[in-house]
Every structure is written in C-alpha cells, then in structure tokens.
C-alpha cells in the first residue's frame, strides 16, 4: 500500500519512525474498508511527493495495529496526526480537502 516515500507505520516501528524522527511526521490512520480513507489516500500520496525531504509521511492500518491508535485516542478514521518532536501538534479527523491538510503541515515546517 505504501509508496511515493510513504512509510508503512506499525505498532512495532512507531516510536522509531515517528516519535524519534528529526522531521515532522504526518501519520494517516486508515482501514481498507473505510470509504473516506480511500478518498483521502491520493491526497496523502500527492503530499508525500510535494513535501519530500521536509515532512515524513506514514500510513497506519488500524485493523492490523490497535495499540498506537488507542494510545492516541484515534476513534474515527481517517485521522491524520502531525507529530513534531515526538508530540502531536495537529489532528485532522475525517476526510479533509488537500488545502486544509497543506495549511496544517505548513505550520510545522521550516
């Protein structure tokens, strides 16, 4: 599923790939059965290309990984969390247009 430099984030690699990242990280919490998740996926892929080198982007399948979504109280999907310095700095729940996600990301780069 992951491509375009998108990291497949799991409960096992979350701390290393997200919390210890030297760049901000956008994590897309999704599931295969979720229609809005499928709708937002192409936007996330575009952002991975556009923000390459500035922001790390990861996707986490909530059906295969339950500990991390529970830890961050992800109850609805899609949920996009932006982490910076190991902390959540933005939370977007539900389908969001690209410009809303871009605005959230731009606050945390540079």
Show which residues each predicted segment covers.
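Proteins that catalyze or organize thiol-disulfide redox chemistry
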Residues: 1-26, 31-56, 63-110
């Amino acid at each position: 599923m992951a491509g375009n430099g998108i990291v497949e984030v799991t409960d096992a690699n979350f701390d290393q790939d997200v919390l210890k990242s030297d760049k901000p990280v956008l994590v897309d919490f999704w599931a295969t059965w979720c229609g809005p998740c499928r709708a937002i996926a192409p936007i996330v892929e575009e952002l991975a290309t556009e923000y390459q080198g500035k922001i790390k982007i990861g996707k986490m399948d909530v059906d295969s990984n339950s500990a991390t979504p529970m830890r961050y109280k992800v109850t609805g999907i899609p949920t996009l969390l932006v982490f910076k310095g190991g902390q959540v700095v933005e939370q977007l729940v539900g389908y969001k247009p690209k410009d809303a996600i871009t605005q959230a990301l731009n606050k945390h780069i540079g």
